[in-house]
UniProtKB/Swiss-Prot annotation:
This is Protein ARK2N. It comes from Homo sapiens. There is a cross-link at K358 (Glycyl lysine isopeptide (Lys-Gly) (interchain with G-Cter in SUMO2)). Residues 175-200 form a coiled coil. PANTHER family: RING ZINC FINGER.
């Protein structure tokens, strides 16, 4: 609404009076090329409405400031005081520098506003064209910084209307002092918040770098531990055949921790069975020897001479064999059953086949394995019974499913 009224007044004044043109020509010599171009457009075709509508808001405010600066020296104080009252009762967001879109602009403009009212008073009393020159200079600076928004325009209109009369500016002096204090406090708060945020960012970045350093060192320590565990695994089974160790490390699960867990499980089962081996009967011993022979015949990793050689190698060889049973997928179905138990249960699983082999297929083993040499079954007390082996296999399968 204010802008439309101002444009109407400007058109009337430009058609009737010539001094605004002269004052603008004087200021145009001091300004840069953009202001000169605007003054030339005013001289050539001011009456053309399309040219006026095509010019930016900057030209309209230039005309309005020049016309109002001349009107202020001739007219009374009533319309200006009314306008000042309007602008003073406006929103506080218009007064605070943070309302503008550009923070750097707001700081510079607020510092410039503090110095301008005294200069404006002397300029209004002496020469009205000086005020228009100062306002034109500030506007050209604004247009160069490309911060011509509606908030800026309203703020500038309020300032130009405030500076047209000395008494109005003096009345506003007390309020502007409070406003300066408020602006200074707001600026201090903003700077403190920005400094705090910067310090927080610095702290977080350093803590992140420390964390990354710690994680890298811990990961290197973990790598060392893993490599050490793999070394201990390979050092634990030097007596076994090298094919078994290579098969465990590469062909099946290549994770050294999993192999280590398998090793521990197998060792625990073997220790349990060696503790309780005194109370076993001869039937269980026979079943254990049959399972050992079956595993030797099917897997083909161990030879009977190696098993019968000494006790320590026999303590290590079952360890490798049980790791094979636990970690390889192809031998889960082969645990002590193969063709004899499948004759009884063609579609049965591991537990059914082993139980049937325990109860009903002893005669089959006697009839089919008569030619087999039984010298390979000398260290059978260190072996686990088929039930423990099957339980270990099933637990290992479920554990691997959870891992995957």
């Amino acid at each position: 609404m204010k802008m439309e009224e101002a444009v109407g007044k400007v058109e009337e004044l430009i058609e009737s009076e010539a001094p605004p043109k002269a004052s603008e020509q004087e200021t145009a010599k001091e300004e840069d090329g953009s202001v000169e171009l605007e003054s030339q457009v005013q001289k050539d075709g001011v009456a053309d409405s399309t040219v006026i509508s095509s010019m930016p808001c900057l030209l309209m405010e230039l005309r309005r400031d020049s016309s109002e600066s001349q009107l202020a020296s001739t007219e009374s104080d009533k319309p200006t005081t009314g306008r000042v009252y309007e602008s003073d009762s406006s929103n506080h967001c218009m007064l605070s520098p943070s309302s503008s879109g550009h923070l750097a602009d707001s700081d510079t403009l607020s510092s410039a506003e503090e110095n301008e009212p005294s200069q404006a008073e002397t300029a209004v009393e002496g020469d009205p064209s000086g005020v228009s020159g100062a306002t034109v200079g500030r506007k050209s600076r604004r247009s160069r910084s490309e911060s011509e928004t509606s908030t800026m325009a309203a703020k500038k209109n309020r300032q130009s209307s405030d500076k047209q009369n000395g008494r109005v500016a003096k009345v506003k002096g007390h309020r502007s002092q409070k406003h300066k204090e408020r602006i200074r406090l707001l600026r201090q708060k903003r700077e403190a918040a920005a400094r705090k945020k910067y310090n927080l960012l610095q702290d977080s970045s350093t803590s992140d770098s420390d964390l990354t350093c710690d994680s890298s060192t811990s990961s290197s320590d973990d790598d060392e531990e893993v490599s050490g565990s793999s070394k201990t695994i390979t050092a634990e089974i030097p007596d076994g055949p090298p094919v078994v160790a290579h098969y465990d490390m590469s062909d099946t699960n290549s994770d050294p921790e999993v192999v280590n867990v398998d090793n521990l499980l197998a060792a625990a089962v073997v220790q349990e069975h060696s503790n309780s081996v005194g109370g076993q009967d001869t039937g269980a011993t026979w079943r254990t020897s049959g399972l050992l022979e079956e595993l030797n015949a099917e897997a083909g990793h161990l030879d009977p001479g190696f098993l019968a050689s000494d006790k320590t190698s026999a303590g290590n060889a079952p360890l490798n064999e049980e790791i094979n049973i636990a970690s390889s997928d192809s031998e889960v179905e082969i645990v002590g059953v193969q063709e004899h138990a499948r004759c009884v249960h063609p579609r049965g699983g591991v537990i059914q086949s082993v139980s049937s082999w325990k109860h009903g297929s002893g005669t089959q083993y006697v009839s089919t394995r008569q030619t087999q040499s039984w010298t390979a079954v000398t260290p059978q007390q260190t072996w686990a019974s088929p039930a423990e082996v099957v339980d270990l296999t099933l637990d290992e399968d479920s554990r691997r499913k959870y891992l995957l």
